[in-house]
């Protein structure tokens, strides 16, 4: 098959190069005692995420959105950080459902109002929702 014949979007990976890059990064981080949780927003591949966790020593996976986290959890990954706030009743129900399944999912927040929403949703469902608080250190990102 020629490259122009591949239906897009498609993930095309040079496996040998990926293996070398993963080994180099994992080795460097291991030498320095750094725990790492790589972002899945580029590859969006549970298979690659599993490789990073089970073979390269990552402590989990970071997802941009709740939907990505659900895909990773459905594939057996259960240490997940969602880098963006999860808002809206339907999404909060989905987040709570992951916690009820036993998925170790943490959500980044930067708004106290959202923390209160998480607290109420968690209280109603009888679960906890771990959060990490994003602090604006002047870069306004």
Where are these regions (language model features)?
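Generic N-terminal amphipathic, Lys/Arg-enriched alpha-helix
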Residues: 1-13
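N-proximal short alpha-helices
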Residues: 2, 21-25, 88
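Structured helix-beta-strand junction loops
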Residues: 9, 32, 101-102
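Generic structural signal for well-ordered, non-membrane alpha-helical segments
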Residues: 11-14, 22, 111, 115
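Short, surface-exposed alpha-helical recognition segments that flank or form part
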Residues: 13-16, 106
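N-terminal glycine-rich anion-binding loops that anchor highly charged ligand groups
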Residues: 17-50, 64
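Active-site-proximal beta-alpha core segment in soluble small-molecule metabolic enzymes
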Residues: 39-141
